[in-house]
Design a protein with these regions (language model features):
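Gly/Pro-rich hinge or "lid" segments in bacterial periplasmic/extracellular proteins
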Residues: 11-25, 31-34, 40-109, 113
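Alpha-helical secondary-structure segments
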Residues: 33-37, 82-83, 111-113, 161-210, ...
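Ligand/substrate-recognition segments at binding pockets and active sites
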Residues: 91, 245-316, 388
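Ligand-binding "clamshell"
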Residues: 145-158, 306, 320-335, 393-397
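Structural transition elements
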Residues: 207-246, 267-269, 357
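Long beta-strand-rich cores associated with HINT superfamily self-processing modules
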Residues: 390-421
Protein backbone atom coordinates (compact mmCIF):
# COMPACT_ATOMS: atom_id res chain seq x y z
CA UNK A 1 0.00 0.00 0.00
CA UNK A 2 1.25 3.47 -0.90
CA UNK A 3 0.70 4.73 2.66
CA UNK A 4 2.13 1.71 4.48
CA UNK A 5 5.13 3.78 5.56
CA UNK A 6 3.07 5.69 8.09
CA UNK A 7 2.75 2.52 10.20
CA UNK A 8 6.49 1.76 10.17
CA UNK A 9 7.13 3.18 13.68
CA UNK A 10 5.28 0.08 14.95
CA UNK A 11 7.56 -2.84 15.75
CA UNK A 12 8.09 -5.11 12.72
CA UNK A 13 5.56 -3.16 10.60
CA UNK A 14 8.03 -2.54 7.77
CA UNK A 15 9.19 -6.17 7.76
CA UNK A 16 5.57 -7.39 7.75
CA UNK A 17 4.76 -5.03 4.88
CA UNK A 18 7.69 -6.40 2.87
CA UNK A 19 6.64 -9.99 3.57
CA UNK A 20 9.77 -10.66 5.61
CA UNK A 21 7.85 -11.44 8.81
CA UNK A 22 4.37 -12.85 9.49
CA UNK A 23 1.62 -10.48 10.63
CA UNK A 24 1.58 -12.33 13.96
CA UNK A 25 4.88 -10.58 14.77
CA UNK A 26 3.43 -7.09 14.29
CA UNK A 27 3.82 -5.07 17.50
CA UNK A 28 0.08 -4.71 18.12
CA UNK A 29 -2.14 -6.88 20.28
CA UNK A 30 -5.63 -6.65 21.73
CA UNK A 31 -5.45 -6.72 25.52
CA UNK A 32 -9.25 -6.80 25.80
CA UNK A 33 -12.29 -5.70 23.77
CA UNK A 34 -11.51 -2.02 24.28
CA UNK A 35 -7.71 -1.89 24.61
CA UNK A 36 -4.88 -2.13 22.08
CA UNK A 37 -1.27 -2.46 23.15
CA UNK A 38 1.23 -1.07 20.63
CA UNK A 39 4.98 -1.73 20.74
CA UNK A 40 7.20 0.67 18.76
CA UNK A 41 10.58 0.19 17.13
CA UNK A 42 11.76 3.11 19.28
CA UNK A 43 10.28 6.11 21.07
CA UNK A 44 8.34 8.29 18.61
CA UNK A 45 7.41 11.71 20.06
CA UNK A 46 4.55 12.23 17.59
CA UNK A 47 3.01 8.73 17.73
CA UNK A 48 -0.27 9.91 19.29
CA UNK A 49 -0.59 12.29 16.32
CA UNK A 50 -0.18 9.30 14.01
CA UNK A 51 -3.03 7.31 15.51
CA UNK A 52 -5.39 10.22 14.75
CA UNK A 53 -4.54 9.87 11.04
CA UNK A 54 -7.09 7.98 8.87
CA UNK A 55 -4.63 5.21 7.97
CA UNK A 56 -4.72 4.18 11.64
CA UNK A 57 -8.51 4.14 11.93
CA UNK A 58 -10.02 0.81 13.03
CA UNK A 59 -11.99 -1.20 10.47
CA UNK A 60 -14.85 -3.65 10.87
CA UNK A 61 -13.24 -6.86 9.61
CA UNK A 62 -16.54 -8.57 8.82
CA UNK A 63 -17.77 -5.59 6.76
CA UNK A 64 -14.47 -5.15 4.89
CA UNK A 65 -14.30 -8.85 4.03
CA UNK A 66 -17.91 -8.84 2.85
CA UNK A 67 -17.39 -5.82 0.53
CA UNK A 68 -14.04 -7.02 -0.83
CA UNK A 69 -12.60 -4.85 -3.63
CA UNK A 70 -15.62 -2.53 -3.44
CA UNK A 71 -14.88 -1.45 0.12
CA UNK A 72 -14.69 2.35 0.38
CA UNK A 73 -15.59 2.99 -3.26
CA UNK A 74 -19.24 3.96 -2.66
CA UNK A 75 -21.21 5.38 0.25
CA UNK A 76 -22.88 2.02 0.92
CA UNK A 77 -19.60 0.06 0.84
CA UNK A 78 -18.04 2.21 3.57
CA UNK A 79 -18.57 1.87 7.32
CA UNK A 80 -18.86 4.86 9.70
CA UNK A 81 -18.46 5.60 13.41
CA UNK A 82 -18.36 9.42 13.41
CA UNK A 83 -21.09 12.05 13.86
CA UNK A 84 -22.20 11.74 10.21
CA UNK A 85 -22.52 9.03 7.57
CA UNK A 86 -21.90 9.54 3.86
CA UNK A 87 -24.88 9.08 1.52
CA UNK A 88 -25.83 9.87 -2.08
CA UNK A 89 -22.21 9.94 -3.22
CA UNK A 90 -22.30 10.95 -6.88
CA UNK A 91 -18.69 10.97 -8.01
CA UNK A 92 -17.46 14.33 -9.32
CA UNK A 93 -20.87 15.86 -8.51
CA UNK A 94 -21.47 15.82 -4.78
CA UNK A 95 -22.54 13.90 -1.69
CA UNK A 96 -24.49 14.21 1.55
CA UNK A 97 -23.54 13.78 5.19
CA UNK A 98 -26.43 12.60 7.36
CA UNK A 99 -26.50 12.52 11.14
CA UNK A 100 -25.34 9.16 12.49
CA UNK A 101 -27.97 7.85 14.90
CA UNK A 102 -25.48 5.24 16.13
CA UNK A 103 -22.89 7.88 17.14
CA UNK A 104 -21.90 7.76 20.81
CA UNK A 105 -22.37 11.53 21.28
CA UNK A 106 -25.27 12.10 18.91
CA UNK A 107 -26.99 14.49 21.35
CA UNK A 108 -24.23 17.04 20.61
CA UNK A 109 -24.79 16.90 16.84
CA UNK A 110 -27.28 19.58 15.80
CA UNK A 111 -27.33 19.26 11.99
CA UNK A 112 -29.42 16.55 10.36
CA UNK A 113 -27.82 16.84 6.93
CA UNK A 114 -24.95 18.55 5.10
CA UNK A 115 -24.97 18.80 1.30
CA UNK A 116 -21.70 19.00 -0.64
CA UNK A 117 -21.54 20.11 -4.27
CA UNK A 118 -18.43 19.64 -6.42
CA UNK A 119 -18.08 22.90 -8.35
CA UNK A 120 -14.69 23.34 -9.99
CA UNK A 121 -15.33 26.77 -11.51
CA UNK A 122 -15.20 29.45 -8.82
CA UNK A 123 -17.49 31.83 -10.75
CA UNK A 124 -20.22 29.17 -10.63
CA UNK A 125 -19.53 28.61 -6.94
CA UNK A 126 -19.85 32.34 -6.21
CA UNK A 127 -23.12 32.54 -8.12
CA UNK A 128 -24.53 29.66 -6.07
CA UNK A 129 -23.47 31.45 -2.89
CA UNK A 130 -24.96 34.79 -3.96
CA UNK A 131 -28.29 33.15 -4.82
CA UNK A 132 -28.37 31.39 -1.42
CA UNK A 133 -28.07 27.93 -2.98
CA UNK A 134 -25.05 27.18 -0.76
CA UNK A 135 -23.90 28.44 2.65
CA UNK A 136 -20.11 28.19 2.30
CA UNK A 137 -17.73 28.64 -0.64
CA UNK A 138 -13.98 28.81 -1.11
CA UNK A 139 -12.90 31.78 -3.24
CA UNK A 140 -10.11 32.34 -5.72
CA UNK A 141 -8.19 35.61 -5.86
CA UNK A 142 -10.29 37.42 -8.46
CA UNK A 143 -13.36 37.24 -6.20
CA UNK A 144 -11.67 38.22 -2.93
CA UNK A 145 -12.02 41.99 -3.39
CA UNK A 146 -15.76 41.60 -3.98
CA UNK A 147 -16.24 40.28 -0.43
CA UNK A 148 -13.19 41.55 1.48
CA UNK A 149 -15.07 44.35 3.28
CA UNK A 150 -17.96 42.10 4.28
CA UNK A 151 -16.76 41.29 7.79
CA UNK A 152 -19.80 39.10 8.52
CA UNK A 153 -19.22 36.68 5.66
CA UNK A 154 -15.61 36.91 4.40
CA UNK A 155 -12.61 35.26 6.02
CA UNK A 156 -9.19 33.73 5.39
CA UNK A 157 -7.13 31.13 7.19
CA UNK A 158 -3.60 29.89 6.75
CA UNK A 159 -3.04 26.22 6.05
CA UNK A 160 0.06 24.30 7.13
CA UNK A 161 0.46 22.99 3.60
CA UNK A 162 3.05 23.91 0.99
CA UNK A 163 2.72 24.01 -2.79
CA UNK A 164 5.76 23.39 -4.94
CA UNK A 165 7.11 22.20 -8.29
CA UNK A 166 8.25 18.61 -8.45
CA UNK A 167 11.23 18.25 -10.79
CA UNK A 168 11.35 14.75 -12.25
CA UNK A 169 14.85 13.58 -13.16
CA UNK A 170 13.97 10.36 -14.98
CA UNK A 171 11.04 9.68 -17.33
CA UNK A 172 10.41 6.48 -19.24
CA UNK A 173 13.81 5.17 -18.19
CA UNK A 174 15.62 8.21 -19.65
CA UNK A 175 17.14 11.22 -17.90
CA UNK A 176 15.07 14.40 -18.26
CA UNK A 177 16.70 17.85 -18.65
CA UNK A 178 15.97 18.30 -14.93
CA UNK A 179 18.73 15.83 -14.15
CA UNK A 180 20.85 18.99 -14.47
CA UNK A 181 21.26 20.50 -11.01
CA UNK A 182 21.97 23.89 -12.58
CA UNK A 183 18.69 23.83 -14.53
CA UNK A 184 16.81 22.98 -11.33
CA UNK A 185 18.58 25.85 -9.58
CA UNK A 186 17.80 28.23 -12.47
CA UNK A 187 14.09 27.36 -12.28
CA UNK A 188 14.07 27.82 -8.49
CA UNK A 189 15.61 31.28 -8.89
CA UNK A 190 13.36 32.35 -11.76
CA UNK A 191 9.91 32.52 -10.12
CA UNK A 192 8.74 35.65 -8.28
CA UNK A 193 6.75 34.09 -5.44
CA UNK A 194 5.59 37.33 -3.82
CA UNK A 195 3.75 38.32 -6.97
CA UNK A 196 2.33 34.79 -7.23
CA UNK A 197 0.93 34.93 -3.68
CA UNK A 198 -0.16 38.55 -3.46
CA UNK A 199 -1.48 39.17 -6.97
CA UNK A 200 -2.16 35.89 -8.79
CA UNK A 201 -3.57 33.98 -5.81
CA UNK A 202 -4.69 36.88 -3.58
CA UNK A 203 -6.29 34.46 -1.12
CA UNK A 204 -4.14 34.65 2.00
CA UNK A 205 -1.38 32.42 0.62
CA UNK A 206 2.18 33.42 1.55
CA UNK A 207 5.36 33.10 -0.55
CA UNK A 208 7.48 30.12 0.47
CA UNK A 209 11.16 29.37 -0.09
CA UNK A 210 10.77 26.56 2.46
CA UNK A 211 9.14 23.12 2.38
CA UNK A 212 8.16 22.65 6.04
CA UNK A 213 5.37 25.23 6.55
CA UNK A 214 5.21 27.86 9.25
CA UNK A 215 2.95 26.93 12.14
CA UNK A 216 3.40 23.17 11.80
CA UNK A 217 5.70 22.44 14.72
CA UNK A 218 7.97 24.04 17.31
CA UNK A 219 11.36 22.81 18.48
CA UNK A 220 12.67 22.14 21.99
CA UNK A 221 13.28 25.91 22.36
CA UNK A 222 9.64 26.69 21.58
CA UNK A 223 10.48 28.36 18.25
CA UNK A 224 8.78 27.52 14.97
CA UNK A 225 10.84 25.35 12.60
CA UNK A 226 11.05 28.11 9.96
CA UNK A 227 11.81 30.80 12.52
CA UNK A 228 14.89 28.78 13.46
CA UNK A 229 16.19 27.61 10.09
CA UNK A 230 14.95 29.98 7.36
CA UNK A 231 15.94 27.52 4.61
CA UNK A 232 15.46 27.85 0.86
CA UNK A 233 16.59 29.71 -2.26
CA UNK A 234 15.27 33.25 -2.68
CA UNK A 235 14.16 34.20 -6.23
CA UNK A 236 16.63 36.34 -8.19
CA UNK A 237 16.23 36.86 -11.95
CA UNK A 238 19.91 37.73 -12.52
CA UNK A 239 21.14 34.66 -10.63
CA UNK A 240 18.55 32.58 -12.51
CA UNK A 241 20.00 33.69 -15.87
CA UNK A 242 23.53 32.90 -14.67
CA UNK A 243 22.51 29.43 -13.46
CA UNK A 244 20.81 28.82 -16.83
CA UNK A 245 24.09 29.62 -18.61
CA UNK A 246 25.78 26.95 -16.46
CA UNK A 247 22.90 24.55 -17.16
CA UNK A 248 23.42 24.94 -20.91
CA UNK A 249 26.98 23.68 -20.45
CA UNK A 250 25.77 20.70 -18.38
CA UNK A 251 23.11 19.86 -20.96
CA UNK A 252 25.18 20.62 -24.04
CA UNK A 253 22.33 22.59 -25.61
CA UNK A 254 20.94 26.13 -25.68
CA UNK A 255 17.25 25.26 -25.84
CA UNK A 256 15.14 22.95 -23.70
CA UNK A 257 11.44 22.05 -23.79
CA UNK A 258 9.88 20.76 -20.58
CA UNK A 259 6.33 19.71 -19.78
CA UNK A 260 4.47 21.09 -16.76
CA UNK A 261 1.86 18.65 -15.45
CA UNK A 262 -1.03 20.49 -13.79
CA UNK A 263 -4.55 20.14 -12.40
CA UNK A 264 -7.43 21.23 -14.62
CA UNK A 265 -9.02 23.52 -12.00
CA UNK A 266 -9.20 27.33 -12.08
CA UNK A 267 -6.63 28.30 -9.44
CA UNK A 268 -4.14 25.67 -10.61
CA UNK A 269 -4.46 26.86 -14.20
CA UNK A 270 -3.55 30.40 -13.10
CA UNK A 271 -0.51 29.18 -11.18
CA UNK A 272 0.60 27.03 -14.12
CA UNK A 273 0.38 29.93 -16.58
CA UNK A 274 2.28 32.17 -14.18
CA UNK A 275 5.05 29.60 -13.66
CA UNK A 276 5.35 29.11 -17.43
CA UNK A 277 5.61 32.86 -17.98
CA UNK A 278 8.25 33.34 -15.26
CA UNK A 279 10.47 30.49 -16.45
CA UNK A 280 10.27 31.43 -20.13
CA UNK A 281 10.82 35.14 -19.39
CA UNK A 282 13.84 34.66 -17.13
CA UNK A 283 15.43 31.59 -18.78
CA UNK A 284 15.64 32.42 -22.49
CA UNK A 285 15.64 29.19 -24.45
CA UNK A 286 13.48 27.21 -22.02
CA UNK A 287 9.98 26.39 -23.33
CA UNK A 288 7.30 25.15 -20.93
CA UNK A 289 4.31 23.22 -22.30
CA UNK A 290 1.41 22.82 -19.87
CA UNK A 291 -0.48 19.51 -19.64
CA UNK A 292 -3.81 19.82 -17.79
CA UNK A 293 -5.28 16.70 -16.19
CA UNK A 294 -8.16 15.82 -13.82
CA UNK A 295 -7.00 15.21 -10.25
CA UNK A 296 -7.00 11.41 -10.36
CA UNK A 297 -5.21 11.20 -13.72
CA UNK A 298 -2.62 13.76 -12.64
CA UNK A 299 -1.76 11.70 -9.56
CA UNK A 300 -1.48 8.60 -11.75
CA UNK A 301 0.98 10.32 -14.09
CA UNK A 302 3.00 11.53 -11.10
CA UNK A 303 3.13 8.04 -9.63
CA UNK A 304 4.28 6.67 -13.00
CA UNK A 305 6.78 9.56 -13.29
CA UNK A 306 5.35 10.45 -16.68
CA UNK A 307 6.08 14.17 -16.41
CA UNK A 308 8.92 16.73 -16.24
CA UNK A 309 7.66 19.46 -13.92
CA UNK A 310 4.53 19.01 -11.80
CA UNK A 311 2.60 21.57 -9.75
CA UNK A 312 1.95 19.76 -6.49
CA UNK A 313 1.13 20.31 -2.84
CA UNK A 314 1.47 18.52 0.46
CA UNK A 315 -0.43 18.81 3.72
CA UNK A 316 0.75 17.27 6.99
CA UNK A 317 -0.21 13.83 8.25
CA UNK A 318 1.02 14.76 11.74
CA UNK A 319 2.59 17.76 13.50
CA UNK A 320 6.28 17.17 12.84
CA UNK A 321 8.67 18.27 10.03
CA UNK A 322 9.24 14.61 9.18
CA UNK A 323 5.82 14.46 7.49
CA UNK A 324 7.22 16.76 4.78
CA UNK A 325 10.86 15.68 4.70
CA UNK A 326 10.72 11.88 4.77
CA UNK A 327 8.92 11.55 1.42
CA UNK A 328 12.00 12.68 -0.49
CA UNK A 329 14.09 9.75 0.66
CA UNK A 330 15.29 7.83 -2.38
CA UNK A 331 13.14 4.76 -1.64
CA UNK A 332 9.96 6.55 -0.50
CA UNK A 333 6.71 5.87 -2.36
CA UNK A 334 5.99 9.61 -2.62
CA UNK A 335 9.41 10.62 -3.97
CA UNK A 336 8.11 10.15 -7.53
CA UNK A 337 10.90 12.12 -9.22
CA UNK A 338 14.01 9.89 -9.06
CA UNK A 339 15.69 12.26 -6.63
CA UNK A 340 18.37 10.45 -4.65
CA UNK A 341 21.01 11.77 -2.26
CA UNK A 342 22.57 9.23 0.15
CA UNK A 343 23.51 12.06 2.51
CA UNK A 344 19.88 13.21 2.66
CA UNK A 345 18.69 9.62 3.19
CA UNK A 346 21.14 9.27 6.08
CA UNK A 347 19.96 12.50 7.72
CA UNK A 348 16.31 11.46 7.59
CA UNK A 349 17.18 7.98 8.84
CA UNK A 350 19.03 9.45 11.82
CA UNK A 351 16.22 11.92 12.61
CA UNK A 352 13.73 9.06 12.50
CA UNK A 353 15.94 6.65 14.43
CA UNK A 354 18.96 7.16 16.65
CA UNK A 355 18.21 10.84 17.37
CA UNK A 356 14.63 10.24 18.52
CA UNK A 357 15.80 10.40 22.14
CA UNK A 358 17.64 13.72 21.69
CA UNK A 359 15.10 16.38 20.72
CA UNK A 360 17.67 19.17 20.19
CA UNK A 361 20.00 17.18 17.91
CA UNK A 362 17.05 15.69 16.02
CA UNK A 363 15.62 19.17 15.36
CA UNK A 364 18.99 20.40 14.08
CA UNK A 365 19.31 17.37 11.80
CA UNK A 366 15.88 18.01 10.29
CA UNK A 367 16.85 21.64 9.64
CA UNK A 368 20.07 20.57 7.92
CA UNK A 369 18.14 18.03 5.84
CA UNK A 370 15.71 20.66 4.54
CA UNK A 371 18.64 22.96 3.72
CA UNK A 372 20.39 20.20 1.75
CA UNK A 373 17.19 19.29 -0.11
CA UNK A 374 16.35 22.85 -1.17
CA UNK A 375 19.62 24.76 -1.40
CA UNK A 376 22.19 22.22 -2.57
CA UNK A 377 20.26 19.43 -4.27
CA UNK A 378 17.46 21.81 -5.35
CA UNK A 379 15.21 18.75 -5.63
CA UNK A 380 12.02 20.83 -5.84
CA UNK A 381 10.84 24.44 -5.95
CA UNK A 382 8.63 25.65 -3.06
CA UNK A 383 6.10 28.23 -4.28
CA UNK A 384 3.75 29.23 -1.45
CA UNK A 385 2.18 28.26 1.83
CA UNK A 386 -1.49 27.88 1.14
CA UNK A 387 -4.10 30.25 2.42
CA UNK A 388 -7.82 29.91 1.88
CA UNK A 389 -10.27 32.76 1.33
CA UNK A 390 -13.92 31.91 1.86
CA UNK A 391 -17.41 33.25 2.34
CA UNK A 392 -19.80 31.78 4.88
CA UNK A 393 -23.39 32.75 5.60
CA UNK A 394 -23.70 34.56 8.95
CA UNK A 395 -26.29 32.05 10.16
CA UNK A 396 -23.89 29.09 9.69
CA UNK A 397 -22.24 28.65 13.10
CA UNK A 398 -19.88 26.30 14.91
CA UNK A 399 -17.82 24.96 11.98
CA UNK A 400 -14.37 24.05 13.31
CA UNK A 401 -11.32 24.31 11.03
CA UNK A 402 -8.29 22.00 11.44
CA UNK A 403 -4.78 22.37 10.02
CA UNK A 404 -4.04 18.65 10.08
CA UNK A 405 -6.08 15.76 8.66
CA UNK A 406 -9.76 16.54 7.89
CA UNK A 407 -10.15 20.27 7.23
CA UNK A 408 -13.46 20.75 9.02
CA UNK A 409 -15.47 19.33 11.90
CA UNK A 410 -19.24 19.73 11.71
CA UNK A 411 -20.04 17.96 14.97
CA UNK A 412 -20.74 21.30 16.70
CA UNK A 413 -22.11 23.16 13.65
CA UNK A 414 -25.63 24.57 13.55
CA UNK A 415 -27.79 26.99 11.55
CA UNK A 416 -29.64 29.93 13.08
CA UNK A 417 -32.58 31.75 11.56
CA UNK A 418 -31.40 34.34 9.03
CA UNK A 419 -32.50 37.22 11.24
CA UNK A 420 -29.98 35.99 13.82
CA UNK A 421 -32.40 34.23 16.17
Amino acid sequence: AEYAFIAFPIKNAEAVNKGEKPVTELGVKAVDDLTLEVELEQAVPYFLNLVAFPSYYPLNEKFVTEKGDKFGLESDTTVYNGPFVLTDWKHEQGWKLKKNDQYWDKKTVKLDEINYSVVKEVATRVNLYDTNAIDFALLSGEFVDKYRNNKEEFGTYSQVSTYFLRMNQKRGGQDTPLKSQKLREAIALSIDKKNLSNVILNDGSKPADFLVPKGLATGPDGKDFQETFKNGIKPDAKKAAAAWEEAKKELGKDQVTIELLNYDTGNAKKVGEYVKDQIEKNLKGVTVNIKLQPFKQKLKLETEQDYDLSYAGWGPDYADPMTFLDMFQSNHSHNQMSFADPKYDDMIKKAGGELMGDAKKRWEELGKAEKLLLEQDVALVPLYQRGDAYVQKPNAKGIVHHNISPEYSFKWAYMTEKDGK
